[in-house]
């Protein structure tokens, strides 16, 4: 019985081996995250002659090379939630923090919870790729939102009032194309109304936008009443051009990532089942599968709900028992975000005779707020998802 505590950092780890009773077998030493370093560590653990369990704290992506190397060589690995490890280490009165001491504390954790250590398994390559792409999708979405905010701020300063006119009309890039074409209120006014109307209609027809004389008149009237803040100068034009370029580049990158996610998700057996669920489209289906991963790794539907962080743990002390509890939020925040978008889709489309939408409406009828009702609906949705997908896999014994 040998607990191996590994304190992971970027590019290297500190390793400590400990037996019951606090007997240190391997004094804390450093291992580099290289093939040579991992090979030496594996050889050391295999030569111990003991039942070895390696324990690591979850550290984002830093621990992944160590976990991969140990699992490929058949060594038991358990990656522990960082909050659990922090609370275990905080039992000490003295506040001492070094890599060597952390490795010893992790080894002690392995001994204290030897029977409760859960083995870590590497997910299938498809799920790993999907999760990687999903993270990049969210990053690109965040950048896209910022790019749109920046562009809108610039647009308000050179072409005030144009956003309100363009937002209600067809054309995903109509506003940015319009700003790139006409650049500034002064430029529109210098053209004159007759010339601008002809030019706008010709441009709209070429771009495939609605060719509307009335729209051209509204734009010219707005330009006459608008007060631009930035001058019609070369510096302003550079800022506008670059803002639009960034906006289109980030949007194209996000679309490319989503396309690849859809292609990968379609190779999974459960994709068609998830896609057939009400209000789950081509965008939400791959994102949902990416965040949940292989549903068979959860021992029950409650485990999936806890993984999403929407569970509400009970709170009771003496005669007091809390009735209204907040969700824990100790789980995958990306899954919560995606799940909330799924619930928004349910509320928008209102599928008839659907148990999840009926449940949301029931909660609203009980006086619950819209957000609370949707979180309750997400809880039910994940239970349904777990039941359908696990039952689907049970019907495919060859895959199992």
Predicted features along the sequence, with ranges:
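A detector of single, family-specific signature residues
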Residues: 1-400
């Amino acid at each position: 019985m040998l607990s191996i505590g590994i304190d992971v950092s970027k590019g290297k780890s500190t390793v400590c081996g400990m037996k019951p009773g606090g007997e240190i077998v391997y004094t804390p030493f450093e291992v580099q995250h290289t093939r040579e370093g991992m090979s030496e560590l594996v050889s050391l653990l295999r030569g111990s002659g003991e039942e070895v369990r390696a324990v690591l704290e979850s550290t984002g992506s830093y621990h992944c090379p160590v976990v991969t190397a140990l699992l490929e060589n058949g060594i038991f690995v358990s990656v522990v939630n960082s909050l659990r490890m922090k609370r275990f280490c905080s039992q000490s009165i003295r506040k001492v923090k070094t890599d060597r001491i952390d490795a010893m504390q992790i080894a002690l954790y392995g001994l204290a919870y030897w029977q409760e250590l859960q083995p870590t398994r590497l997910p299938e390559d498809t799920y790993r790729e999907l999760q990687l792409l999903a993270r990049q999708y969210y990053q690109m979405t965040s950048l896209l939102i910022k790019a749109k905010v920046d562009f809108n701020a610039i647009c308000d300063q050179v072409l005030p009032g144009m956003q309100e006119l363009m937002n209600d009309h067809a054309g995903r890039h109509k506003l940015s194309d319009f700003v790139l074409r006409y650049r500034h209120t002064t430029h529109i006014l210098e053209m004159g109304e007759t010339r601008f109307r002809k030019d706008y209609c010709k441009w709209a027809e070429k771009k495939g936008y609605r060719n509307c004389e009335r729209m051209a008149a509204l734009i010219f009237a707005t330009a006459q009443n608008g007060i631009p803040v930035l001058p019609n100068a070369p510096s302003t034009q550079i800022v506008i051009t670059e803002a639009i370029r960034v906006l289109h580049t980030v949007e194209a990158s996000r679309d490319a990532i989503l396309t690849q996610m859809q292609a990968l998700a379609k190779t999974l057996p459960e994709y068609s089942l998830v896609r057939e669920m009400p209000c789950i489209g081509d965008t939400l289906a791959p994102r949902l599968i990416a965040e949940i991963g292989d549903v068979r790794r959860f021992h029950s539907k409650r485990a999936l709900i806890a993984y999403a962080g929407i569970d509400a743990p009970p709170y009771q002390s003496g005669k007091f028992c809390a009735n209204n509890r907040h969700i824990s939020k100790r789980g995958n925040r990306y899954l919560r975000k995606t799940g909330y978008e799924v619930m928004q889709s349910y509320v928008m489309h209102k599928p008839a005779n659907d148990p999840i939408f009926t449940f949301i409406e029931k909660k609203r009828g009980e006086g619950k707020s819209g957000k609370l009702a949707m979180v309750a609906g997400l809880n039910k949705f994940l239970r349904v998802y777990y039941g359908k997908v696990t039952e689907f896999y049970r019907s495919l014994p060859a895959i199992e």
